[in-house]
Amino acid sequence: CIIPKSAADKIVEKAKVDNFDFLSLQKESAEKRHSLIALIHALQEEVGGKEGEFVHYGVTTQDIVDTGIMLQTKEAYNIILDHTKDLISTLAKLTKEHRSTLMIGRTHGIHAIPITFGFKLSIWLDELLRSQRRLKQLLENDVFVGSISGAVGSYASFFGRGREVEKAVLKELGLAVPNISWQPSRDRFSEFASVLGIFSGTLGKIGRELFTLMKTEIDEVHEPFKKGEVGSSTMPQKRNPALIEGLASLTQPVFKDVDLMFQSLLIDGERDAIHWRNEWVALPEITSYLDAQIVNATYILSGLKVNQDKMLDNLNKQGALPYSERIMFEVGLKLGKQTAHEIVYQAAMTALEENKD
């Protein structure tokens, strides 16, 4: 043992949340200007005697904080992974249901050619499946590691048994063992954040698309609405896309936090706290916001009202114009594609200018 077993047993016995006054810890932390020293002193006092001298033995503050944050991050990851499965299942069901629901496709915000709503949803589904795959790869990449390596990560204070101690502790905690110290290497957190950022971007895009399709003049979808919900304090008739706006709006703070996580890569020497502490702000926000988006998206899609009649009306709004590509290729079989394009282009421009089909 690195420390006496009696000391280890006493430390385990006393290291309970209920044994600490967090207001006192906060006060001492502010006075000492150190994030962990107050807890170390409080635990030493709880343990007492000679055994108390072995509290925080061999490790450094960043070992404790990094390992603790990684445990929280892994717990958040597992929640996100579970909720992602529900989201994908919900979207897959909706996609199958609307595989033949005709609508107009839009490019640059303008009517293009016919598609199905199921086709649009399939693209979203494929993107979400890629995010799910990236999430699972985080485990394969050993992103969730702990750190029990001492002052500069060299195990100098473990009497030659540092790796042995680290492996035993991290096995107990369910974290992977790093190849070497990662105190100055924050790429794992940045990788985690970037994967979640991509996921959030997809959900933000879905939210923005649904926001557009729910506009009064388009009216192709509606988010779930319960009796008694209020859209406006001054306009009683309003049914606003409140859930959809919430889905879309959370992507921006996630993106900002992902950028903050990348700043934490810029560590000086063996470690510093200039950028390291960014993680304390960014990681909880990224995981919380993304999970809220996933849960929100699942609810929206599970109760989405699809106005198939309006989709068909919008498809037919410009008469035969959405079929100009097909007509061009049919004509092109005899005249050539470029010649056919010019002929159909002239006819289409005339129809648009004279408001004809």
Q: Where are the predicted features?
A:
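A helix-coil-helix interface module used to build multimeric assemblies
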Residues: 2-149, 153-155, 161-168, 177, ...
